[in-house]
C-alpha cells in the first residue's frame, strides 16, 4: 500500500512538472515570436479527428454485449 501511494504521489508531481514546463515553453515562445503571431495559430485543426466515430454498428453491439 505504501508503494502505491508513493508511486501515485510521484506521478502527480511529474504530471505537474510536465504541465508547468509546457507552460514555460509556450510563454517563452510567445515572448520570442510575439503575441500577434501566436494569435493566428489554428488550434482547431484537430477537431476534424473527432467528428465521426470509427466504431461500426457491429462493434457497438459487441461492446454492449460485453458490458452487460
From Swiss-Prot:
Residues 1-23 form the signal peptide. Keywords: Cleavage on pair of basic residues, Cytolysis, Ion transport, Membrane, Secreted, Signal, Target cell membrane, Target membrane, Toxin, Transmembrane, Transport. GO terms for molecular function: toxin activity. It is found in: Secreted; Target cell membrane. Residues 37-68 form a propeptide. It comes from the Eukaryota. The keyword Membrane applies. Expressed by the venom gland. The keyword Signal applies. GO terms for biological process: killing of cells of another organism; monoatomic ion transport. GO terms for cellular component: extracellular region; membrane; other organism cell membrane. Antibacterial peptide with activity against both Gram-positive and Gram-negative bacteria probably by forming pores in the cell membrane. Also has weak hemolytic activity. Does not show antifungal activity. Belongs to the non-disulfide-bridged peptide (NDBP) superfamily. Short antimicrobial peptide (group 4) family. This is Non-disulfide-bridged peptide 5.6. It comes from Hoffmannihadrurus gertschi.
Amino acid at each position: 500500500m505504501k508503494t502505491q501511494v508513493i508511486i501515485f504521489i510521484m506521478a502527480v508531481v511529474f504530471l505537474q512538472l510536465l504541465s508547468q514546463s509546457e507552460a514555460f515553453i509556450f510563454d517563452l515562445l510567445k515572448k520570442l515570436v510575439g503575441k500577434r503571431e501566436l494569435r493566428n495559430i489554428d488550434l482547431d485543426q484537430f477537431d476534424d479527428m473527432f467528428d465521426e466515430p470509427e466504431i461500426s454498428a457491429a462493434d457497438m453491439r459487441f461492446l454492449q454485449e460485453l458490458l452487460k
